[in-house]
């Protein structure tokens, strides 16, 4: 074992073992441990450990081990505890070494499972882990922006007036832009966490793409086109790739840079290398990719119209079932960044609406099946609000046929949205009725029409073709 690993184990022993630790974090020089019972800490033993420079008693036990060393010690303590830094430790064993072995075995099984699923599914999980924590912010900022847009329209129409209303609109827009304008920074932070890099460095790389402080007189040139590089060019695709590369460089530097200068040298060199690559290489190239992707998808929706809408609406539910729908998250965000709205999301939302229609048909058609109806009582209300997993995994998928007819209903609703055209959403996250406040360009009626048609399509196809005699007459959730 390395001296840092030995130091980590001695610290764990002195603070009362893994069972007495709630979580672990670290700063530049200290490992900060939140303990469950302070009486179990042997402070004299802790201070006498070789490598411990000092101990500070606070709301956390702060063990000073020095710059550079602290990252390695905290990391090994995290591995032994079985919990990532900052997260609550699950106490499975009184012997932390046995706990570590059990965690290692669990990690091995998880790794083997990932290998079986393939790299593509691992990529989807990574995308989900980066963006799912941001969804509440998207929803909140999007709804506040929607309220600001409604108030602005009412002001322009003369239906309301007053300086306070104008100020309120300004404040709401500032709150909305607090999320959308700095999305690259949030993405960089979350990507760094996912890739095992320092979150702050990921945020800096995200902020670098905003080209803060540049004016028309001191623009940076795109080396591929000769034109000025635009703030945010390359979007989140470029940020994610840059932070992934940053994580590789930072980890390697931690291994080779001496502990005494690690805290200074590693972040400086990492940002220097990745910052230059981001500005001159990643932003221009990712800009080509993201611009092309958004153009192609919008073109497919515009040109395909009804047909494209049906295909997206019909096949989105199986993508959700397989977890593949997460691959659309960066696409939605890029569409919002470039055009102000994602025209893909309202069509995809029809998949959930078709499932709601199918569930309503099952409620009517299978009156004798009390088990099914009890399940629907809990799953159907949230289905209207766009939370479809209870219906997918609790009702339609186990029954088989209703899942297929729900997909058909979603396809019909998607065809309506595609046929009407230009129905977009200004933020991601909600679906179903919950998406209504986020619909752009006053296309609310078009979206409602799509929902109603999807409900009806799912209901009709399920009522006539989506049930069996066993479903209708049995008292179990099965066909």
Curated annotation (Swiss-Prot):
Pathway: Cell wall biogenesis; peptidoglycan recycling. Residues 5-87 form the PTS EIIB type-1 domain. InterPro entries: Glu_permease_IIB, PTrfase_EIIB_Cys, PTS_EIIC, PTS_EIIC_1, PTS_IIB_1, PTS_Sugar-Specific_Components. Its EC number is 2.7.1.-. It is a multi-pass membrane protein. The keyword Kinase applies. Keywords: Cell membrane, Kinase, Membrane, Phosphotransferase system, Sugar transport, Transferase, Transmembrane, Transmembrane helix, Transport. It catalyses: N-acetyl-beta-D-muramate-(1->4)-N-acetyl-D-glucosamine(out) + N(pros)-phospho-L-histidyl-[protein] = 6-phospho-N-acetyl-beta-D-muramate-(1->4)-N-acetyl-D-glucosamine(in) + L-histidyl-[protein]. Residues 125-479 form the PTS EIIC type-1 domain. Coiled coil: none annotated. It is found in: Cell membrane. One of its GO terms (cellular component) is plasma membrane. The phosphoenolpyruvate-dependent sugar phosphotransferase system (sugar PTS), a major carbohydrate active transport system, catalyzes the phosphorylation of incoming sugar substrates concomitantly with their translocation across the cell membrane. This system is involved in the uptake and phosphorylation of MurNAc-GlcNAc, the principle peptidoglycan turnover product of S.aureus, yielding cytoplasmic MurNAc 6P-GlcNAc. The EIIB domain is phosphorylated by phospho-EIIA on a cysteinyl or histidyl residue, depending on the transported sugar. Then, it transfers the phosphoryl group to the sugar substrate concomitantly with the sugar uptake processed by the EIIC domain. The EIIC domain forms the PTS system translocation channel and contains the specific substrate-binding site. This is PTS system MurNAc-GlcNAc-specific EIIBC component.
